[in-house]
């Protein structure tokens, strides 16, 4: 499974260009997407999940062209874990996942089998009778990961999955993504370099709608050597000026 993005542009009605003639190949395995807020990462994921139609350019998923006639076929191949998880707070974990399985059109017996499997894989089996509103942020992310995997997608997209989590939960989520990437392509979007160093062999660095770098983490670190420094100052205006540069 691979994703090919060619000359992709997304321009909004207010004139803002969120993605600017971008090209990218996402291979099988876990692929990192690194960039600051406003770099265009979320817009790219909205395109890849068929939520947003690009202004121009092409995207293909396993040789299937992104077009209105193919969206339903593409959606069956994609699982998505958004940054914010808000899944039916009055339902238990199992009830929530059973409902998501129904929405995905999964046969009852098969749905139960998959739910049991993924609850065990994500260490949620002992919490399946808890209401969603009783779960910690990390547990909610894990439930979100299960719902994204229920229909057995070939391409899993995760948006900032470790943001706001404690160190132990962050490591758990990262390990799960590495595990699930053995059977599918995973796009891991984050602004935390440590997460990508622990999980990805390849990544892309995004800024202002363009990809500044694509390649391995080791190559990126080699390129950065001698070009990174730390400056401590109490002058806020100077700090902002340095940040702009």
Where do the protein language model's features map onto the residues?
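Walker A (P-loop) phosphate-binding loop of ABC-type ATPase nucleotide-binding domains
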Residues: 36-40
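Conserved ABC ATPase "signature" region
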Residues: 98, 102, 109-127
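Helix-to-loop junction immediately C-terminal to a conserved catalytic motif
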Residues: 49
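Conserved ABC transporter NBD signature motif
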Residues: 57-67, 73-74
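A short, flexible loop at the N-terminus of ABC-type nucleotide-binding domains that lies
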Residues: 1-5, 9-21, 27, 68-70
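Catalytic Walker B motif of ABC-type/P-loop ATPase nucleotide-binding domains
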Residues: 156-159
